[in-house]
């Protein structure tokens, strides 16, 4: 996906109240921008380092700027906006980049499913294949050279795993897709040290037939796209 106009830049001061971030613009002005990431953002916050943001022309928005990307001290780029993960996944599926998800005739977003009343991120259907339920997760946590998910305890994520398992039991195909929005992550693993219940459930889901995939994003202030498969350590 191309960003038009391309993202503007500044320097990070602080993130607070989950949805707010203070930055310094290139001209030295300090402003508050919207943070579209509700997670802990563990190892994603580097005060003084470069950040990039988009600008909305919607006059009803209190904060016109949205934090999109951050640079680490090592020079890696992190995609802060978790909302872009689904769009990156959809674009990659349509382009045939995710080879494991090729061959479907229809793609729908946010379809209701499961006994716990969730909405699947992507539902792929085809007359010749079983329905494929794809749950998308953004992976941005890098610790000691290893990529992890989640970055905080996620009961919602646990619910999604249970419902993917339910789809497999019903004869459908179920896929957990990690969209890796950190250029320094080269493999993904369940963060047992952060959410042991999620790690245990992921292992159970995989054993029952839920497929676990990860694809890495190439990112810049101009564009972003999923470009290659990333190993998942189960």
Curated annotation (Swiss-Prot):
It comes from Shewanella piezotolerans (strain WP3 / JCM 13877). HAMAP family: SfsA. It holds the Pfam family SfsA. PANTHER family: SUGAR FERMENTATION STIMULATION PROTEIN A. It comes from the Bacteria. Disulfide bonds: none annotated. GO terms for molecular function: DNA binding. Belongs to the SfsA family. This is Sugar fermentation stimulation protein homolog.
